[in-house]
């Protein structure tokens, strides 16, 4: 009877979905989730803990996170006349946006493959989602994108810049054409911009329907779950109406502000990751049968020989390293695996496991 009652009351589109699953990484070198591999020094950790000791966790946090926002505006060089809304990770910001625009016949457009949460949250909210296939080299099919925008008149267009899971950076001219052709919101998701050196932040003043999304997850603060969405105040004002109160907790606000007081350390970590990325790309390119794709992010997508991705992924995991198997998604990602750029030791362990796994 319980199963029947659940089926009766849970929306059919929810029942058709699968819950987001995270692989168990216990006792493994974790190179599957695009996390920053570096931690703080013992001295910095002690200073951070001292700051946390002063937090009154019996009180609700500042609902507007005003002090943190001021620090973020400086760090991100947000134009003075633009506004910002914070989310419990970028996922919550995506949900806020789609909650605000959802309605009968409304649609969402994004190139694919891309960040899976665009599609998943759109489906959760009953929006029509239209993915536009990238070309075989994962470049943007601009004519196809523009045609779909004309036909579907989307409420929101998402562009990951650089793209996830492919790692490449679409051209600024292509994004500009998409922005100018779009009738609704365009959200440029810059989760990995710190590794690419490119941003649409200065263009917020040029387009009143452009929002730029960032996160602190890729610069070593994934555990805080903090995302930022920035743009024209008129949009932010409406999105504030769907934001749950106190969504950014006390510890996240204090910890993020503390981290942003040491920007040199964050920038140095990004520089180290970019250097390690280039070294890892060169090493992968030397392996016969492995096709390596360009990356402007903190991960590398590579293609295995046909029908070998699952076996290679399993062999690497058996040797103590967890990466991401994307082959099961099919389409352009068939035979593809993705590895996060780790420390020198982690990257060495991955390459050793990959070489050994390919021989079996």
UniProtKB/Swiss-Prot annotation:
Indicate the enzyme's highest-level EC class.
Answer: transferase
GO biological process annotation, one example: L-histidine biosynthetic process
Q: Which reaction(s) does its UniProt entry say it catalyses?
A: L-histidinol phosphate + 2-oxoglutarate = 3-(imidazol-4-yl)-2-oxopropyl phosphate + L-glutamate
User: What is the E.C. number?
Assistant: 2.6.1.9
Q: In which pathway does it act?
A: Amino-acid biosynthesis; L-histidine biosynthesis; L-histidine from 5-phospho-alpha-D-ribose 1-diphosphate: step 7/9
Q: Which GO terms describe its molecular function?
A: histidinol-phosphate transaminase activity; pyridoxal phosphate binding
Cross-referenced InterPro entries: Aminotransferase_I/II_large, HisP_aminotrans, PyrdxlP-dep_Trfase, PyrdxlP-dep_Trfase_major, PyrdxlP-dep_Trfase_small
Enumerate the transmembrane spans.
Answer: none
Q: How would you summarize the oligomeric state and partners of this protein?
A: Homodimer.
Q: Which NCBIfam families does UniProt cross-reference here?
A: hisC
Q: Name the family the entry cites.
A: Belongs to the class-II pyridoxal-phosphate-dependent aminotransferase family. Histidinol-phosphate aminotransferase subfamily.
**Protein name from the UniProt record:** Histidinol-phosphate aminotransferase 2
Organism listed in the record = Nitrosococcus oceani (strain ATCC 19707 / BCRC 17464 / JCM 30415 / NCIMB 11848 / C-107)
């Amino acid at each position: 009877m319980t199963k029947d009652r659940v089926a009766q009351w849970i929306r059919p589109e929810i029942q058709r979905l699968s819950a987001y699953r995270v692989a168990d990484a216990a006792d493994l070198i974790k190179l599957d989730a695009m996390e920053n591999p570096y931690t703080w020094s013992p001295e910095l950790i002690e200073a951070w803990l001292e700051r946390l000791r002063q937090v009154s966790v019996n009180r609700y946090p500042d609902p507007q996170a005003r002090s943190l926002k001021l620090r973020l505006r400086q760090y991100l060089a947000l134009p003075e006349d633009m506004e910002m809304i914070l989310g419990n990770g970028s996922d919550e910001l995506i949900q806020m946006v789609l909650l605000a625009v959802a309605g009968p016949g409304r649609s969402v457009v994004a190139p694919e493959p891309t960040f899976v949460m665009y599609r998943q949250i759109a489906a959760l909210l009953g929006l029509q989602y239209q993915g536009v296939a990238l070309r075989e080299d994962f470049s943007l099919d601009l004519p196809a994108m523009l045609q779909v925008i004309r036909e579907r008149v989307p409420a929101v267009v998402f562009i990951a810049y650089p793209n996830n899971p492919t790692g490449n950076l679409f051209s600024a001219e292509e994004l500009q054409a998409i922005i100018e052709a779009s009738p609704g919101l365009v959200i440029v998701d810059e989760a990995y911009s710190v590794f690419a050196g490119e941003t649409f932040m200065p263009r917020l003043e040029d387009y009143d329907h452009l929002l730029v999304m960032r996160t602190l997850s890729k610069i070593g603060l994934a555990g805080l779950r903090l995302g930022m969405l920035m743009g024209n105040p008129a949009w932010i004002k409406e999105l504030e109406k769907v934001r749950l109160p106190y969504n950014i907790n006390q510890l996240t606000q204090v910890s993020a502000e503390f981290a942003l007081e040491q920007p040199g350390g964050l920038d140095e970590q990004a520089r180290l990751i970019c250097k390690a990325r280039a070294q890892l790309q060169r090493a992968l390119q030397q392996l016969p049968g492995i096709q390596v794709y360009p990356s402007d992010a903190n991960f590398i997508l590579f293609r295995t020989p046909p029908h070998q991705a699952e076996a290679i992924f399993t062999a690497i995991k058996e040797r103590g390293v967890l990466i991401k198997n994307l082959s099961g998604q099919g389409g352009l990602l068939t035979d593809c695996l993705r590895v996060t750029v780790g420390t020198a030791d982690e990257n060495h362990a991955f390459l050793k496991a990959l070489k050994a796994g390919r021989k079996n």
